[in-house]
């Protein structure tokens, strides 16, 4: 995977002039003035208009975190090379991941995440804006990852690359040498950490928040203890066990006691996050209490983070994600499955 990633990056189009993250200036008559506006960490998303106005700020790092299901037959790295927001770097969801499991894109260790972010040139003082090519999909996973490791200055670009382009904003069709090297180095840094090597310099320090992550044993205990409400972001058909999972050999169905809240309920037709009142109605309709603890899962830990994003807008900032999600649960021996199609 590492070699393929590096080689694909190096086959990019000829490098364009790199974007400098300086203070953005907006023209007003014959004078120019700063157009920077601070972002609130109370909100999980920023608009494309906000990002466009502040794209040149040195303290803002923009990440393309596109990832697609296998059946979509889309290559996020190649798509990044063809068109991305100016100055954005590529965050490889499969590359910046745990190497000690066969499960897909699981949360890496603190040391590995710090090494990967440092290789990308991210520092703790930076505000991070994450987007993807779907609109509101895998970017939410990376938003959650940064928060797990103690970085609150992170936001998802509402509507993602599709809304950016629909708004008439420019994209780059080539990457600078610096961007290629950083993207490749991030994956290589992760590999080295898991091989026991030391990486330096480390510019990004982590502070792990265990309450935002659930392990299999905790999910198993919750079936009896009912400490939190467990919501599942997959489709109702997969949840009920009447439609197949996208992964070959994996039965559908759900974890006992969990409730289905399909992730598309969180956004509108343009894949922008719904207003708070509409989000609240969606959870109320599924009999989810906002006054009690909530944890979320999905197929592989990606779309569960979209539910966490919506709940964050409602003030639920401590929603835990079951990282292994359905893939881990359904393949583990002797665990109960409700409505299995197997």
Swiss-Prot record:
Protein purpose: Catalyzes the transfer of a sulfur ion from a donor to cyanide or to other thiol compounds. Substrate preference is 3-mercaptopyruvate > thiosulfate. Involved in embryo and seed development.
Protein species of origin: Arabidopsis thaliana (Mouse-ear cress)
Tissue distribution: Expressed in roots, rosette and cauline leaves, stems, flowers and siliques.
Cellular localisation: Cytoplasm
Disruption of the gene: reported phenotype: No visible phenotype under normal growth conditions.
Pfam families reported in the protein's UniProt record: Rhodanese
GO molecular function: 3-mercaptopyruvate sulfurtransferase activity; thiosulfate-cyanide sulfurtransferase activity
The keyword Transferase is assigned to this record: yes
Alphabetized CDD domains for the sequence: TST_Repeat_1, TST_Repeat_2
Listed InterPro entries: Rhodanese-like_dom (IPR001763), Rhodanese-like_dom_sf (IPR036873), Thiosulphate_STrfase_CS (IPR001307), TST/MPST-like (IPR045078)
BP terms from Gene Ontology: embryo development ending in seed dormancy
GO cellular component assignments: cytoplasm; cytosol
Top EC category: transferase
Designated name of the protein: Thiosulfate/3-mercaptopyruvate sulfurtransferase 2
């Amino acid at each position: 995977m590492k070699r393929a990633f590096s080689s694909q990056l190096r086959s990019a189009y000829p490098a364009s002039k790199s974007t400098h993250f300086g203070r953005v200036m907006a023209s007003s008559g014959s004078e120019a003035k700063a157009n920077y506006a601070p972002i609130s960490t109370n909100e999980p998303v920023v608009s494309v208009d906000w990002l466009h106005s502040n794209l040149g700020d040195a303290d803002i790092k923009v990440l393309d975190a596109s990832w697609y299901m296998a059946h979509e037959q889309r290559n996020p790295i190649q798509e990044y090379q063809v068109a991305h927001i100016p100055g954005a770097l590529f965050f490889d969801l499969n590359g910046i991941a745990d190497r000690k499991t066969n499960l897909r894109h699981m949360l890496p260790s603190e040391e590995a995440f710090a090494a990967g972010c440092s290789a990308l040139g991210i520092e703790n003082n930076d505000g991070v804006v994450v987007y993807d090519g779907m609109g509101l999909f895998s970017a939410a996973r990376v938003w959650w990852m940064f928060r797990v490791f103690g970085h609150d200055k992170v936001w998802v670009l509402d509507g993602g690359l599709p809304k950016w382009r629909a708004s008439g904003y420019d994209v780059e069709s080539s990457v600078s040498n610096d961007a290629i090297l950083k993207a490749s180095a991030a994956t290589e840094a992760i590999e080295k950490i898991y091989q026991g090597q030391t990486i330096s310099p480390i510019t990004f320090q982590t502070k792990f928040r265990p309450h935002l992550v659930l392990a299999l044993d905790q999910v198993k205990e919750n079936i009896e203890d009912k400490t939190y409400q467990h919501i599942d972001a997959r489709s109702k058909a997969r949840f009920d066990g009447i439609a197949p999972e996208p992964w070959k050999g994996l039965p559908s169905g759900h974890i006992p006691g969990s409730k289905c809240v399909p992730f598309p309920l969180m956004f509108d037709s343009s894949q922008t996050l719904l207003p708070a009142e509409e989000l609240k109605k969606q959870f109320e309709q599924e009999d989810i209490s906002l006054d009690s603890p909530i944890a979320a899962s999905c197929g592989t830990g990606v779309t569960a983070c979209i539910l966490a994003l919506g709940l964050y807008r409602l003030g639920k900032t401590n929603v835990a994600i079951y990282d292994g999600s359905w893939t881990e649960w359904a393949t583990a021996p002797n665990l109960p499955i409700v409505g299995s199609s197997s």
